[in-house]
Amino acid sequence: MSDQALSFLKDFLAGGVAAAISKTAVAPIERVKLLLQVQHASKQISAEKQYKGIIDCVVRIPKEQGFLSFWRGNLANVIRYFPTQALNFAFKDKYKQIFLGGVDRHKQFWRYFAGNLASGGAAGATSLCFVYPLDFARTRLAADVGKGAAQREFTGLGNCITKIFKSDGLRGLYQGFNVSVQGIIIYRAAYFGVYDTAKGMLPDPKNVHIIVSWMIAQTVTAVAGLVSYPFDTVRRRMMMQSGRKGADIMYTGTVDCWRKIAKDEGPKAFFKGAWSNVLRGMGGAFVLVLYDEIKKFV
């Protein structure tokens, strides 16, 4: 095996392992965030049964659906997240070679910064093409609030994908893809671009204290998450439409979704669950730091 292939494999494994650990740890926060985001577009949650906020959601989920339901959709998330994050990290370094080859970070700061933004954004968009149906299934499984099998919309990952594919075809599994690409480029560009730029400006980037590294990652994750959050809300609402027919369809398209959320629910609706997203982001920051640590040992 060539050095380049070995390096790619190391990136893939280090990123995937770090991601799977942290994602399982923050799965309950992730589910709360998703329910707050999509409940307005859910057929299972009537207006009077909607969650009032994070605390209400955390209290009611175990009562109504059982404690383990906090991890509903987590298996799909781990399966999805392993290739997503691993591909992001692996492609990021490949794209960095393309965008940053021969760029001096101290003498050409803005070119260095732009190259980092481009490599982070391109990595996110590329990996999204491969794993979008898994992301879609994870969202629909997490949004499923039925208690027993009879009340559930889907029995599991395979059932969700086959049901939607039979109903809507491949298009149903890629519902909201366009706005996802827009959001992921913004998020990944900040997530990787600002993180790498900040680390690169330190005197000795290879030997950064883990606390400093975590603080940089924490800030980057929170900012990136908030900036791209409205795109995430719209894409999840669009995902909730797959499998619906006729009068059940709430939005005619992405633009209509943006317009209706703003008009009917107000601008705040774009940020429903955003606070839990910041908390969840601590896991994202942990992934970046853990990835750097794992790479030292492989």
UniProtKB/Swiss-Prot annotation:
Record region (Important for transport activity): 235-240
Activity control summary: The matrix-open state (m-state) is inhibited by the membrane-permeable bongkrekic acid (BKA). The cytoplasmic-open state (c-state) is inhibited by the membrane-impermeable toxic inhibitor carboxyatractyloside (CATR). Proton transporter activity is inhibited by ADP:ATP antiporter activity.
Gene: SLC25A4
Membrane topology recorded in Swiss-Prot or TrEMBL: Multi-pass membrane protein
Modified residues (N6,N6,N6-trimethyllysine): 52
Chain location of the short sequence motif Nucleotide carrier signature motif per the record: 235-240
Modification sites for N6-methyllysine: 52
Solcar repeats: 6-98, 111-201, 212-297
Naturally occurring in which organism (per UniProt): Bos taurus
Residue spans, topological domain Mitochondrial intermembrane: 1-7, 100-109, 200-210, 292-298
Reactions catalysed according to its record: ADP(in) + ATP(out) = ADP(out) + ATP(in); H(+)(in) = H(+)(out)
Name of the protein this chain belongs to: ADP/ATP translocase 1
Assembly with partners or alone: Monomer. Found in a complex with ARL2, ARL2BP and SLC25A4/ANT1. Interacts with ARL2BP. Interacts with TIMM44; leading to inhibit the presequence translocase TIMM23, thereby promoting stabilization of PINK1.
Presence of keyword Transmembrane helix: yes
